[in-house]
Amino acid sequence: MKKIIFIILAFGCMLSLSAFDVMDISGDIGLGYMNHNMVTVYNDSLKTNLAGGLEAALGEGNLTMDAPRSVDSYNALALGLKLKVSYVYANISVGFPFTQVPTGDDPLGEKLKAMGATNRLNNSVIVDSQIGLGINILKSLPVNIFVGGGLGINYIQTKRKLPDEFVQTIVDPITGNPVAKELNETRSIAMSGLGFTVALNYYFTKNIGISFDIKDTVYFIPMSNKRYYKGKAINGSGFTYTITKEKKQDIQSLIKYSWANNLALRLAVAFKL
């Protein structure tokens, strides 16, 4: 209850300051399109074996080799909100992708692909946020431009059902009998980076207008990268299986580096308080 009262009082203070031109408060809310591309470069265990084979066949030398990499692309309908208070702004977009478009080499996904795993996603979400500093150009005119830049934080969670052909390969190592009847893959990735926001605003009244926003962020600092599987055993019991390596509950040890780009375009209702 105290938190609710505090939020109401804080919002009331902001409105009061805005009314006396002490604080400039504006923003927009609307629908748009989101494109998210995730690039992952993996550590390559083949390099050591290839170097040994070449040395035996050709003689001692140095080997340079491209590391395997994959690109996962997502297109989504997005909801977005931007709030600007004086020179500080916050921008968040939430996208709902329905398909994944993978290209390149994903060592963890090759077996699933061979079994006919679908690229259709279920209950997946991309949350892309940005906070930073920005200014309004031509602020006093009905048509003005907002330009800002700052820190971006992105979280993506994708889910897909794995094919029955693959589930049937999960068998008891002793009896050879199937032990699972359903399996779903979940990927969870969080990253941070830097980005910018540009918006063209047109106010047809003093406080209400329309806005076209462009938000683009490059992510290069990994925060979390997990891939796990949920399913049902043959007796109906639910289970969760997390890929591990060297006793770590993630796949970071398989990844050399990764980066991502998120682009969001939005047509929105603009407002000023």
Task: Identify what each model region corresponds to.
Residues M1-D24:
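Cleavable N-terminal export/targeting peptides
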Residues A19-S86, N262-K272:
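Short glycine/proline- and aromatic-enriched beta-strand/turn motifs that initiate or cap beta-hairpins
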Residues V39-R69, F98-S124, Y155-I189, S224-K256:
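Flexible, solvent-exposed loop segments that connect beta-strands
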Residues D72-G80, S124-Q130, M191-G195, A260-A264:
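Transmembrane beta-barrel architecture of outer-membrane proteins
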Residues L79-I174, R266-L273:
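Gram-negative (and chloroplast) outer-membrane scaffold detector with strong preference
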Residues N201-L273:
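Predominantly the C-terminal beta-signal and adjacent terminal strand-loop region
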